[in-house]
């Protein structure tokens, strides 16, 4: 007996497209589409869609809808294409044989024994299974490709899916895949921008601030750090080992910056330029205390993290030493470059001053050196962690500057 009498699924398809145009969260889009199918009579109890994403931490993402629990989103750190979980899945079979649709009666067919995931569904009371693959761009989808997605549709109904049920799911698949493709492309774009430029710059680029010279003046606590003896380490270590060492350093330093709400603007070789935007008046005013305190906490965390790794016997960490300079001042946050190649960053005298402050960390044999512009903005309790280094000439800076060191890093 047919379970759904859907003469026309245009309304469902239209609703899916409308959700995509309205930029609804992907969870709402999937939830709405599945609920409409169920309301139309399709005995759907579970739908899952999976696809690869471009992200430094995750290989893939899946969205699972069930009648009982609604929508759940999962991320996969690593998709092992040689592992048994993937190789014994219906999608491996489909991609290997260039099959775009696979239907199996879970409650009847012995074939399901080759697919552990279907045996699991059978134990949970499912009776029918339909898998469909959509390729983007015309070429067949591959396991490594971002150009497509896989879907599976399951029911617990004793009679399984009827012909009109399957027709309904097929008809809904194209608009659903199109809407999800927009979401996937948007997420890949955001992930790439956030990874290579940081969320603040990435957000500004997506908002349209891409013209040369576009920018804003703001006050910020500035951070500049660099790895000591980087040339010697690069010469002494194989390339792969040196890259591993750099990543340990970046995890300690840049990781601490981001945890405190700072923005890593640039990684230049082994140097890190970051800033903590201040709310309120410019550097000439009394504000910026919170930004300065965040920068100091990040510096303390970075050095403490490195010390902890050394105590644990981390061989890469044992070779690492880095100095940090922290300053506060006005900068122009915007982009500059050629007409065809622009770069977002911070520009101004304060950027030079924080770099010169970081230079003094090496000269004075300190881990963290802080300018008086920072110290004047923090609380008296926060100043207790600092020791006065007196006034020093900074290369290229007209007048001597009073500098301080984090006492805990001496």
Regions found by a protein language model. Give the residues of each.
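Catalytic NTP-binding/metal-coordinating core of nucleotidyl cyclase/transferase enzymes
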Residues: 209-297
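Helix-loop-beta substructure at the N-terminus of cytosolic sensory domains
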Residues: 22-70, 260
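Regulatory cytosolic signal-relay segments
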Residues: 163-217
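Alpha-helical scaffold within the catalytic cores of cyclic-nucleotide enzymes
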Residues: 247-261, 282-324, 349-359
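Regulatory sensory and allosteric helical modules in signal-transduction proteins
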Residues: 69-131
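Regulatory loop-to-helix N-cap segments in sensory/regulatory domains
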Residues: 136-170
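Catalytic/regulatory signature loops of cyclic-dinucleotide turnover enzymes
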Residues: 327-328, 336, 349-376
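Cytosolic regulatory/linker segments at or just downstream of nucleotide-handling modules
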Residues: 361-410
